[in-house]
Curated annotation (Swiss-Prot):
The keyword Cell inner membrane applies. In the C-terminal section; belongs to the bacterial STING family. One of its GO terms (biological process) is defense response to virus. It is a single-pass membrane protein. The chain crosses the membrane at residues 20-42. The keyword Nucleotide-binding applies. It comes from Roseivirga ehrenbergii (strain DSM 102268 / JCM 13514 / KCTC 12282 / NCIMB 14502 / KMM 6017). GO terms for molecular function: nucleotide binding. Effector protein of a CBASS antivirus system. CBASS (cyclic oligonucleotide-based antiphage signaling system) provides immunity against bacteriophage. The CD-NTase protein synthesizes cyclic nucleotides in response to infection; these serve as specific second messenger signals. The signals activate a diverse range of effectors, leading to bacterial cell death and thus abortive phage infection. A type I-D CBASS(GG) system. Its main location: membrane. Keywords: Antiviral defense, Cell inner membrane, Cell membrane, Membrane, Nucleotide-binding, Transmembrane, Transmembrane helix. The cyclic nucleotide binds in the C-terminal bacterial STING region. One of its GO terms (cellular component) is plasma membrane. This is CD-NTase-associated protein 13.
Length: 234
């Protein structure tokens, strides 16, 4: 599991680096254009109405920069969407295929969707397991034999004999913490913690929506359900 988280942390770090490079390139190009126009204005002051032209070009430049930065900022949820694709393609679908090969009937696979990333800590997951057991379920951790792209254990949940459900905590989401820290710390203020919680919730929601979309695309919606902290279905 740690190996998988290291892989996902690498993806998030790579995204942050690319985003920073893109912003720097835009800033450098815009500065170069401005300097070039100013030099031409100084060198040939009387040949063209430089003041009007530079004014228009600076407005166009500003609009273009804002548009490009807007496109970059729209990528804010890309790390969560990338994690969703990795989770479904490298773990969820192979895991379901393996379980279906073993099961004599249909299976139910539940994915836990947290309200915030702290719910995926070891301590909170342990408390969640106790809550599930308190509701009359028997729990058993099982290991998948086939390669699913990353080491991963599943929680087998049973209430009545022969009634089985598989439960997973998508801890791959924890790798988003470094991205959240980067985004919030770059504008650090007294509301940083609140911003981190709010951003974490938005990223979890983006992950959930993309996983749901991929599940429907792969015709797995009859097998997979989502549950929240209160064990209610989404």
């Amino acid at each position: 599991m740690k190996y998988g988280l290291l892989q996902e942390n690498g993806k998030v770090a790579e995204f942050i680096q690319i985003k920073t490079i893109m912003k720097n390139v835009i800033a450098n190009v815009s500065t170069a254009i401005t300097l070039a126009l100013m030099i031409l204005w100084i060198k040939y002051p009387n040949r063209i109405e430089w003041e009007a032209i530079i004014g228009i070009l600076l407005v166009i430049k500003e609009v273009t920069i804002r548009w490009q930065i807007g496109k970059i900022e729209s990528l804010e949820f890309s790390p969560a969407i990338s994690l969703a694709h990795g989770y479904v393609n490298n773990f969820l679908e192979p895991a379901i295929n393996e379980l279906l090969m073993k099961a004599s009937n249909n299976i139910n696979f539940s994915i836990y969707i947290p309200h915030d990333l702290e719910e995926l800590s070891d301590q909170q997951i342990d408390r969640m397991k106790l809550q599930i057991e308190a509701n009359g379920y028997r729990l058993k951790e099982i290991k998948l034999k086939k390669k699913t792209g990353r080491p991963h254990d599943l929680l087998l949940v049973e209430k009545q004999e022969g009634t089985l459900s598989y439960f997973d905590f998508p801890r791959t989401l924890l790798s988003l913490q470094s991205y959240i820290d980067y985004k919030v710390d770059s504008t650090k203020n007294e509301f940083s913690e609140e911003k981190k919680i709010a951003m974490g919730a938005k990223l979890v929601d983006a992950f959930h929506n993309e996983v749901d979309r991929l599940i429907k695309k792969k015709n797995l919606e009859g097998i997979v359900t989502f549950v929240s902290k209160d064990l209610e279905l989404y």
